[in-house]
Amino acid sequence: HAIRSAIKSKDFQSVIVTTDDKKIATIAKSYGAKVPFLRPKTLSRDSTGMDEVILHTIKKLLSMNYEFDILVNRDCTAPFVRNADVRGSIQLLKRTRCHAVVAAYKTHLNPYFNMMEFNKKKFLEFSKKMKHSIVSRQTAPPVFQLTSFQAIDVTQFLKNKKMYTSKVLPYEIKA
């Protein structure tokens, strides 16, 4: 679904799938995606961070003479992100000159109000503390549940080697 949707949108120069699996590569190609290389197994473990995968992908594509300023990461766990939200995320990235935009939605779970964790003495305390008490969810700072869809400024990513810098914005979507 994600491949078809991305191709149908006509918003991208290339729709590329990065994988280490030849079967997945064959399936991706059959839907119209490009798979110009297979990802190394070392970047396909459960313990591998997305920053490492994205850095490898950007460097590999640049070495293959692909030219792009923005990389849109639409992970297989986010197949139903709407094309309008993809376009909105890209526009927000360009307009604000932030480092990345992540599709996200406001969540009712809030570490300032109704989420707790164990302290050193094994008693519960709020996950995030504020200088003043939060008396209701409505007065707590808004927090976002991130999705696995991001629009990333390539130059900034290469400079910082990570997606989540201090200049990341949410593109709010419906949960």
Report the location of each language-model feature.
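Conserved core of the sugar-phosphate nucleotidyltransferase
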Residues: 52, 79-167, 172
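Short phosphate-binding loop-to-helix
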Residues: 22-72, 80-81, 88
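Buried hydrophobic packing segments
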Residues: 6, 54-57, 157
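Residue-level signal for alpha-helix termini/capping positions
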Residues: 7, 62-63, 94
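Conserved beta-strand segments of alpha/beta enzyme cores
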Residues: 14, 34-35, 167-169
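Structural beta-sheet core signal
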Residues: 17, 73, 100-102
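Short, high-confidence coil segments that cap the C-terminus of an alpha-helix
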Residues: 12, 66-68, 95-98
